[in-house]
Amino acid sequence: MVMLKISSFLAVYALVVCQMDSFQAAPVRPGLESITDRVTLSDYEARRLLNALVKDFIQMTAEELEQASEGNSVTAQKRACNTATCVTHRLADFLSRSGGVGKNNFVPTNVGSKAFGRRRRSVQI
């Protein structure tokens, strides 16, 4: 049984080896090789092609940088805080910026060195 398998394998191998002499190796891509051999560019055409490639590359790079800058432009925003302290501070900030509610009816408070509740200092020379 094993001899039959080995002999059949050897026979097939011998046939393949004999047939390989009749086949000649052909290029994998014969069309592409012949096209590249036939194409020749003049100096003017080569410069125009190079300029177009450089222009496209610069445009693509500029677009990528623009998209990156749009994604990274973070506007400064304060965190939202709804606690009573934050709301009070925001209201006080708004009132101080807008001029307050009773700006025209402003009465100055009695503050200073002689205001009620402050100790008087005795000045000794």
Curated annotation (Swiss-Prot):
The signal peptide annotation in the UniProt record is 1-25
Q: What residues bear Phenylalanine amide in this entry?
A: F116
- Transmembrane among the record's keywords? no
A Gene Ontology biological process noted in the UniProt record is:
regulation of cytosolic calcium ion concentration
Q: Give compartment(s).
A: Secreted
UniProt keywords (A-Z) are:
Amidation, Cleavage on pair of basic residues, Disulfide bond, Hormone, Secreted, Signal
Concerning Pfam families, the annotation shows: Calc_CGRP_IAPP
Q: Which residues form the propeptide?
A: 26-77, 122-125
GO molecular function terms listed in the Swiss-Prot or TrEMBL record: calcitonin receptor binding; hormone activity
What cellular component terms from Gene Ontology apply here? extracellular space
Q: Which residues are connected by disulfide bridges in this protein?
A: C81-C86
Source domain of life: Eukaryota
Q: Which family does the entry's similarity section mention?
A: Belongs to the calcitonin family.
Question: What biological function has been recorded for the protein in this entry?
Answer: CGRP1/CALCA is a peptide hormone that induces vasodilation mediated by the CALCRL-RAMP1 receptor complex. Dilates a variety of vessels including the coronary, cerebral and systemic vasculature. Its abundance in the CNS also points toward a neurotransmitter or neuromodulator role. It also elevates platelet cAMP. CGRP1 can also bind and activate CALCR-RAMP1 (AMYR1) receptor complex.
> How is this protein named in the record?
Calcitonin gene-related peptide 1
Q: What phylogenetic lineage does the species belong to?
A: Eukaryota, Metazoa, Chordata, Craniata, Vertebrata
